[in-house]
Amino acid sequence: MLRRAVELVWLIPILPFIGAFLVGFGLISFNKKVNQLRKPAALLLISSVGISAVLSFMVLADQIGGAPCSEVLFSWASAGTFNLEMGYRVDPIGATMLALVSTVAILVMVYSDGYMSHDKSYVRFFTYLGLFTSSMLALILSPNLLEIYVFWELVGMCSYLLIGFWYEREDAANAAQKAFVVNRVGDFGFLLGILGLFWATNSFDFQIVATKMAASISDGSIPHWAAIALCLLLFMGPMAKSAQFPLHVWLPDAMEGPTPISALIHAATMVAAGVFLVARLEPLYSQVPDVQIIVAVIGTITCFLGASIALIQMDLKKGLAYSTISQLGYMMLAMGCGAPVAGMFHLITHAFFKAMLFLGSGSVIHAMEEVVGHDPTLAQDMRLMGGLRKTMPITGITFFIGCVAISGIPPLAGFWSKDEILSKAFDSYPLLWGVGLFTAGLTAFYMFRLYFLTFEGEFRGNNIALREKLLIAAGKSFDPIETKEIQSTHESGWQMTLPLVILSVPSVLIGFLGSPWNNRFGMLLYPEEALEAAKTFSWGEFLPLAIASVMISTCGIVIATIAYAYHWIDLGQSVASRLKIINNFLVNKWYLDKINEYIFVNGSRGLAKKILNLDETVLDKAVVETGLTTLDAGKWLSYFETGRPQFYALIIFGGVISLIVIFNRL
C-alpha cells in the first residue's frame, strides 16, 4: 500500500494535464464539435482531478502513517560535472498541500458546472482549470528551485488566462495584464535569486542550498550582505505571487475573472504558492535572521493594509480580495517569526473557509444577475443586496460560518491557526503582535459588515434610482428598458450549494488538528518541534493571548452589528465626514495604485517616448544618411566607369605611385 502510493504520485499532476491537453487540442482542432460536448469534456476534467485527489489522500495517509520522505530524480541535462536533475519529492508538507489543492480544485470544478453553465466558453474554462490545477500540483512536488520555477511560471500563465477569461471586457483584459506585469517583477527577482544561489552553492536542491549557504556564511566565503541579497531576491517571487506589499496591487483587480477561479486563486493555488515556497525555504531563511525580520515586517504591513482597505469596500468580491491579502500577511508574519508550522496551518484553514466565502459570493452574484443584470458594477455591489438569507438560506448560513471562522472566534478553524501566529509573533516581535492583534479586530468588523450588507435587512436590488446612481458614478450609461422584471433572488442549484456545505465542515472542525496542547498538524510536519511545544505548553501563557484575540474580534463584530444590522449609527457617513483624510486614504487604496501609475506606468511610457524620439532623430537619421552617402559615393564612382583602357591604366599607375610614396615615407 505504502509503496503503491509513492509509485503512483507522478500521476497526480499528469492526469489533469492529460485531460486539459486532450480537451484543449480538441478545441483547437475541432472547436465547434468539442464545444457541443460540454458535459463530456467537463466530466473528463473533473474525473482526472478526482483521481488525483484520491491519490493525494493516499499519499497523505502514507505520510501520516509514518512513511519516510521519498525523492525520485532523473538526469535532465548534464555537461561535465554539472548534472541537472528533475523529478518529484514526497514529504509531509507536500502531501498536505497535494490533498488541499486537489480537494479545493474538484469542489471548484463541480461548482463551476453550475456557475458557468450558460457561458459560451464553458469548455475553455474547464480546460484552463485543469491546466491550472496540474501546474500547482507539479509545483508542490518539485524537488528543487529550478523545477519549481518552471511550474511557478505555468501557474502564472494560467492565472493570466483565467483572470482575463472574459477578455471582451476591457476591465478583465487590463486586470490580466496587470497581474502578468506585477508578477513578472517578482519573478525576475526570483530568477536572479535562483541563479545567485546556484553560483554560491552549485546546486538547486532546497536542502543542499540551505546547508552550503550555512557553511559559506559561517566561514565567511559569502559576505553577510550577499546572503541577505540572495534571500531577498528569492523572496520577491513569493511577494508577488502571495500579494505582499508593495506587489499586492494585482490581486484585487483579479476579481474581474469568473468567481470560481477567484476561489481557486485565493484559496489553494496561486497565492498559496508563495507561502508554500517560503515554507520550503525555511531552512535557508533561518540562516539569515535579518531576512526573517524583513519578511515579518512586510507580512505585518500587508495584513494591516489589506484589512484597512477592506473596511470601505462596497464590491463583495473586492472586499474578500483585500481580506485574502490581509490573511496572506498573517502567513508571512508567521514565516518571518520562524514558525512555518503556524503559517502553513493558517494556509490550510484559510483555504477552506476562503474558498467557501468566494463560492458563496459567486452564488450571491449569480442570483443578483437575474435581478440587476450581468454588469459587475451592479451585480457585485452590496448596496443593492440585503435580505438574501431569506431567499438563499444555504448560501447565507455557510457564508456566516466563513465569517465566524476568519474572524478567529473559537472553536472554528480560523481561531486556532490565527492565534498560533499571534502567539509566535508575541514571543518574537511584540510590536508586530500588537499590529496583528488590532488587525484581527478589523477583520471581524469588515467580514461581518460584508455579511450584514449582503444577507440581512431588506433587499435593495429593485431600487432603480440606486442602480442608475451606481452606474453613472462608474461612468456607465443607464437604460431603464434593460431593467429586469424578476423581483427577487433564489437559492443556487445543487452544483453550487453542495461544495459550500462540504467546505463548511473543515471550516468548523479542521482547526482542532492544530490545538497547541496536541498539535497533530505540527507533529506531521515537524514532529520534534511539536513534541517540544506540547511539553512546554502552558495555559497561563495561552489563555491571556487567546482571550485578547477573541475579545478584540468580538468588539469588531459588535461594532459591525450596531452599524450594519441595527443601523443605530451611520458609520460610513460619520467616517467620511469627520475623518476625510483617512477615508480618502482608504478609498484610494493607500494611493499605491496612483503612485505606481505615476512612477512606473507614466515613467516607463515617458522613457519609451524618449527612446522613440532618440530612435527617430538619431538612429533613423544615421541609417538614412549612411544610405544617402553610399548612393552619392556610388554616383561619384560611376564617373570613373568610362570603358577606356587608357583611363584604367592611368588610375592603376597613379595608385602604384601613391603606394610607393607612402611606403617610402614610412
Swiss-Prot record:
Localization per Swiss-Prot or TrEMBL: Plastid, Organellar chromatophore thylakoid membrane
GO molecular function, one term: quinone binding
Keywords, alphabetical: Membrane, NAD, NADP, Organellar chromatophore, Plastid, Plastoquinone, Quinone, Thylakoid, Translocase, Transmembrane, Transmembrane helix, Transport
Gene3D superfamilies, per database record: 1.20.5.2700
Highest taxon of source: Eukaryota
The UniProt record lists the keyword Transmembrane: yes
E.C. numbers: 7.1.1.-
Transmembrane segments: 8-28, 41-61, 90-110, 121-141, 145-165, 190-210, 220-240, 259-279, 293-313, 328-348, 396-416, 428-448, 497-517, 542-562, 643-663
InterPro entries: NADH_UbQ_OxRdtase_chlpt_su5_C, NADHpl_OxRdtase_5_subgr, ND/Mrp_TM, NU5C-like, Proton_antipo_N
EC top class named in words: translocase
Keyword Electron transport appears in the UniProt entry: no
Membrane topology: Multi-pass membrane protein
Gene Ontology CC: organellar chromatophore thylakoid membrane; plastid
Catalytic activity of the protein: a plastoquinone + NADH + (n+1) H(+)(in) = a plastoquinol + NAD(+) + n H(+)(out); a plastoquinone + NADPH + (n+1) H(+)(in) = a plastoquinol + NADP(+) + n H(+)(out)
GO biological process, one term: ATP synthesis coupled electron transport
Family: Belongs to the complex I subunit 5 family.
Role played: NDH shuttles electrons from NAD(P)H:plastoquinone, via FMN and iron-sulfur (Fe-S) centers, to quinones in the photosynthetic chain and possibly in a chloroplast respiratory chain. The immediate electron acceptor for the enzyme in this species is believed to be plastoquinone. Couples the redox reaction to proton translocation, and thus conserves the redox energy in a proton gradient.
Subunit structure comment from the entry: NDH is composed of at least 16 different subunits, 5 of which are encoded in the nucleus.
Name of the protein this chain belongs to: NAD(P)H-quinone oxidoreductase subunit 5, organellar chromatophore 1
Protein's organism: Paulinella chromatophora
